[in-house]
């Protein structure tokens, strides 16, 4: 089973925002107190964070699908939904985030560095937040938006000061085991090392790391052998150390030809290097400091081969060291030479002026207000596609089972200028309008009543039950009405008394007439 993974495809999804709530306040003596629906909670983000405790991408190889939690729905009494929890994914130092097409999204270097791989969706507004002076009691709320989903590629580039490069079985693993406490797998067959091994070396007061890169062969820059799988691990090192095998038994190999092949492969690979590190542009591989190590001088023919090729290598400008990983011959001098190069590189970084932070490679749209309309043809009929961050987001927030919510969407689109722009591009009533890409929402466009929004029985954002509350009579109005009823009743009694005295009707008729008048007043709600 693999214990080291340096490249994975990760499928990440942010949490979906919670829906807003539609609710009307109810309490004693105030049965309809206005809208009180709370907002939905935002969905959780998926964040990649550099952790010193993580050295491999193995966990994501076994579980590549990661999803943050959703936001909670809004509730009545102005209670908002709970925000989804942020999902933190620890990654090793030196992880590069790319798209499947190879576009670099982020280069994560340094403890605590973060990158939002998938943002959570926005929670929907409740009807309390949607109310205004003109829209006093909305009978709808906005829906929560789904979180971002993306497939990203994580590639680990080892963080080491020195990289050991060379042909398979050149003795790189033996060298790192002899110079540090690392214990890589060592055997007498090619490609024993299948993963980069890191070791820490102490030379005097300087402490640095060296990386044992798996063996390279001719054509590695084009993917042969282990190819690009491990060439990327040399990109961040301050210097390269060529480990040449002086004891090889292969007739077509010698230290000089091995060096020429490795140099050619590194130069070809350097042409494709185009990422920017935290300290600026990376120095090309062929321009970095190099040391040449003639290994296996403890073998009978190894010492002779080293003495034979050393003058030629020194004439080319290389610093050459004859060593033996088995007997530890020459390792002390080699360690101090490495420390000298590492210290010089660190001093150069400290002396360099502070640099401006690198630009964001793919900035996220923030409150983008623009939109565009694209005319298309479908089944020989015109189709107008509306594209833009705001229109697409508004459509996702709309509950299309609620006519009032559809009308609210129509108002927002008209205010943004979508209707005016449709006229300009030649849209006619009845034409098909799509908001969004292939999965967009389809409308039969009518300029004065988009999607039937104007067919509502009441103005958008009103509730008859709540609206009637404002039309109820005041106390003074009730008092005036009561006085008018009493005066009308007194006038009716006086009229009856005048008729009785004039002898128009008898006492029995008067009694029945008075009883009828009394019952009529009781029916009208008079308490007297």
From Swiss-Prot:
InterPro entries: G_OBG, GTP-bd, GTP-bd_Obg/CgtA, GTP-bd_prot_GTP1/OBG_C_sf, GTP1-OBG_CS, GTP1_OBG_dom, GTP1_OBG_dom_sf, OBG_GTPase
A matching Pfam family: DUF1967
Region entry Disordered, spans: 471-490
GO cellular component: cytoplasm
UniProt binding sites for Mg(2+): 173, 193
Family: Belongs to the TRAFAC class OBG-HflX-like GTPase superfamily. OBG GTPase family.
Name of this chain's protein: GTPase Obg
Taxonomic source organism: Paenarthrobacter aurescens (strain TC1)
Lineage, highest ranks first: Bacteria, Bacillati, Actinomycetota, Actinomycetes, Micrococcales
Gene: obg
């Amino acid at each position: 089973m693999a214990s080291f993974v340096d490249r994975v495809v990760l499928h990440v999804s942010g949490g979906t925002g919670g829906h807003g709530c539609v609710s009307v306040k109810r309490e004693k003596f105030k049965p309809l107190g206005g809208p009180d629906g709370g907002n939905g909670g935002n969905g959780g983000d998926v964040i990649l964070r550099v952790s010193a405790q993580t050295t491999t991408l193995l966990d994501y190889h076994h579980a590549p699908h990661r999803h943050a939690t959703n936001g909670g729905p809004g509730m009545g009494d102005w209670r908002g939904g709970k925000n989804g929890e942020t999902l933190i994914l620890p990654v090793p130092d030196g992880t590069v985030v790319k798209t499947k097409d190879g576009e670099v999204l982020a280069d994560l270097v340094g403890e605590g560095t973060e990158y939002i791989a998938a943002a959570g969706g926005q929670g929907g507004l409740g009807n309390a937040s949607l109310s205004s002076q003109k829209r006093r009691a909305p009978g709808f709320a906005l829906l929560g938006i789904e979180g971002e989903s993306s497939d990203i590629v994580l590639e680990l580039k080892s963080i080491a000061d020195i990289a050991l490069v060379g042909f398979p079985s050149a003795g790189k693993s033996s060298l790192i085991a002899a110079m540090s406490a690392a214990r890589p797998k060592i055997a007498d067959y090619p490609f024993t090392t299948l993963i980069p091994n890191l070791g820490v070396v102490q030379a005097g007061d300087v402490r640095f790391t060296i990386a044992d890169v798996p063996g390279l062969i001719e054509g590695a820059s084009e993917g042969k052998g282990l190819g690009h799988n491990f060439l990327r691990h040399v990109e961040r090192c301050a210097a390269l150390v060529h480990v040449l095998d002086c004891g090889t038994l292969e007739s077509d190999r010698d230290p000089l030809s091995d060096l020429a092949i490795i140099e050619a492969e590194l130069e070809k690979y350097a042409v494709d290097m185009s990422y920017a590190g935290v300290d600026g542009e990376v120095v090309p591989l062929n321009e970095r400091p190099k040391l040449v190590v003639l290994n296996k001088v403890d073998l009978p023919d190894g010492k002779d081969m080293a003495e034979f090729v050393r003058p030629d290598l020194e004439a080319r400008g290389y610093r050459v060291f004859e060593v033996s990983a088995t007997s530890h011959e020459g390792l002390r001098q080699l360690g101090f030479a490495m420390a000298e190069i590492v210290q010089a590189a660190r001093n150069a970084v400290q002396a360099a002026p502070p640099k401006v932070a690198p630009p964001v490679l793919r900035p996220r749209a923030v409150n983008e207000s623009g939109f565009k309309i694209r005319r298309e043809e479908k089944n020989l009929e015109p189709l107008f596609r509306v594209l833009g961050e705001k229109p697409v987001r508004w459509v996702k927030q709309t509950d299309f089972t609620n006519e009032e919510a559809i009308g609210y969407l129509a108002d927002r689109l008209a205010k943004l200028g979508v209707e005016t722009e449709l006229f300009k591009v030649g849209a006619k009533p009845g034409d098909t309008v799509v908001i969004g890409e292939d999965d967009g929402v389809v409308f039969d466009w009518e300029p004065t009543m988009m999607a039937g929004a104007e067919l509502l029985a009441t103005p958008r954002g009103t509730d008859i039950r709540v609206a009637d509350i404002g039309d109820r009579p005041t106390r003074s109005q009730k008092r005036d009405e009561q006085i008018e009823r009493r005066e009308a009743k007194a006038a009716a009694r006086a009229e009856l008394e005048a008729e009785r005295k004039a002898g128009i009707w008898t006492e029995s008729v008067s009694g029945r007439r008075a009883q009828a008048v009394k019952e009529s007043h009781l029916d009208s709600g008079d308490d007297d």
